[in-house]
């Protein structure tokens, strides 16, 4: 079930040089990622989907309108407290984690073969952050049809090797039934780039 974007949301996303800063994403309940990636997710996520998210915020509020439930992890304590206080409902399970090691440890408690979409976008407040490791550690817990969203891929600070991978490299670990699509409409932003891996 896709949502209908408001005129304010559309106007904000179309203004690339403003949208790239993401200052209104929380207020407008939008993910802070490439606008075409947002449109793709809006068109392809389903109301019965269970979502695993690393990095809470406007994206959490956006996906909350589309999917069945969200299990979200956040490393900024103030941000975590504010979201949980202002947007607490039965569909969203908020988790605070301080470090990469703590997060990886908690992944062992995830339900296996449960999540339909996995979004890796956690911020730099996570001590020892390694988004690439998070992605790899999640795979054994996911379904064979899980959609993966890897954000900020063009930044060397976020993904080290896998952003250089070709589709075949991902198929070697996810299966030949996967396809890949990259979004990058803000080349002036050094943290740009959203990669989505999805089953055919």
Predicted features along the sequence, with ranges:
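SAM cofactor-binding core of SAM-dependent methyltransferases
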Residues: 31-102
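Surface-exposed cleft-lining segments at the edges of enzyme active sites
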Residues: 23-30, 117-126
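Anionic group-transfer/hydrolysis microenvironments
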Residues: 55, 76, 123, 153-154
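A short acidic, Gly/Pro-enriched loop at the edge of an enzyme's catalytic core
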Residues: 108-117
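N-terminal pre-catalytic "stem/leader" segment of glycosyltransferase-like enzymes
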Residues: 14-24, 45-66, 172-177, 194-200
